[in-house]
From Swiss-Prot:
ATP binds at residues 24-25, 66, 69-71, 132-134, 175, 185, 222. This is Holliday junction branch migration complex subunit RuvB. Keywords: ATP-binding, Cytoplasm, DNA damage, DNA recombination, DNA repair, DNA-binding, Hydrolase, Nucleotide-binding. HAMAP family: DNA_HJ_migration_RuvB. It catalyses: ATP + H2O = ADP + phosphate + H(+). Belongs to the RuvB family. Residues 259-341 are annotated as: Head domain (RuvB-H). Mg(2+) binds at residue 70.
Length: 341
């Protein structure tokens, strides 16, 4: 699978990386870099909730993977001075799984559900009254003797995170009082994050090295920190531990991450659209078959950055390569395509 062998995939690739991420994670909103709009809103809402001694309204965080949704959930709990209970949509298979979590919450605690779009309908039905009225219905007994018992819950905050907000049901989406979309980071913001992480890793990294890593990190802090660790390895072996701009560039070229932040899979996808399908439009199923990947992987992992950077367009008829894609691949843009753009 692409997630396990791709250096610039935005999802976490294992327990070891998750452990490193936790060590590098900012602990407060003051330390959190980027997402200025979401950060400002959360600062105000958290301050107001604490001033009134209330639970924070339920929060929905959505956007591409690796942008800091889990980090923000931890920060929200820390800023509120409460406990955080963490789970994910696929883990909550039965209504009882959710009920066990909810009944163990303390007042104002934060319950973080990652991949909340993957909750089962049965679990969602239990969640609705919990979010709205802080109550749940529990079935006691079995068969004809079974009866429903209503349990009161302490006021709590649900923080839901998703990469696919469009898959949330309307009733669930409507129960979030605070909705924040996380955007890709600028090179300057990522440079600051890389510098901070380098300090925590006790690594010698100059400004040019940080910028070289930042501009190849696809606007994603998780990728930036991963590339930083690989540059550190290269610098320690090849450059006496000094990660300059030239050293970072050499390390990333060795890793097949080009100066636009594209890797072999990105170039393979763009090459397929340009060379096998004459620039498009090409349907998603045909494209998936051409490069040997699942359509969900293309939609969720490969496409977002290519579209955001202007290499690819998604049209009603299929995917179309832009002149920028042709230039990046070193292929002349057909005259008919050049006229379209």
């Amino acid at each position: 699978m692409i997630e396990t062998d791709r250096l610039i995939v935005p999802t976490a690739v294992g327990p070891q990386e998750e452990q490193i991420e936790r060590a590098l994670r900012p602990r407060t909103l003051a330390e959190y870099v980027g997402q200025a709009k979401a950060r400002e809103q959360l600062e105000i809402f958290i301050h107001a909730a604490r001033k009134r001694s209330e639970a924070l309204d339920h929060v929905l965080l959505f956007g591409p993977p690796g942008l800091g949704k889990t980090t923000l959930a931890h920060i929200i709990a820390r800023e509120m001075g409460v406990n955080l209970r963490q789970t994910s949509g696929p883990v909550l298979e039965r209504a009882g799984d959710l009920a066990a979590l909810l009944t163990n919450l303390e007042p104002h605690d934060v319950l973080f559900i990652d991949e909340i779009h993957r909750l089962s309908p049965v679990v969602e039905e239990v969640l609705y009254p919990a979010l709205e009225d802080f109550q749940i219905d529990i079935m006691i007994g079995e068969g004809p003797a079974a009866r429903s018992v209503k349990l009161d819950l302490p006021p709590f905050t649900l923080v839901g995170a998703t990469t696919r907000a469009g898959m949330l049901t309307n009733p669930l989406r409507d129960r979030f009082g605070i909705v924040a979309r996380l955007e890709f980071y600028s090179a300057e913001e990522l440079g600051y994050i890389v510098h901070r992480s380098a300090g925590l890793l006790q690594m010698n990294l100059d400004e040019a090295g940080a910028l070289e890593i930042a501009r190849r990190s696809r606007g994603t802090p998780r990728i930036a920190n991963r590339l930083l660790r690989r540059v550190r390895d290269y610098a320690e072996v090849k450059a006496g531990g000094e990660a300059t701009g030239a050293v970072a560039d050499a390390a990333l070229v060795m890793l097949d991450v080009d100066r636009a932040g594209l890797d072999v899979m990105d170039r393979k996808l763009l090459g397929a659209v340009v060379e096998k399908f004459m620039g498009g439009p090409v349907g998603l199923d045909n494209l998936a078959a051409a490069i040997g990947e699942e359509r969900d992987t293309i939609e969720d992992v490969l496409e977002p950055y290519l579209i955001q950077q202007g290499y690819l367009q998604r049209t009603p008829r299929g995917r179309v390569a832009t002149p920028l894609a042709y230039r990046h691949l070193g292929i002349a843009t057909p005259a008919s395509d050049a006229e379209l753009f």
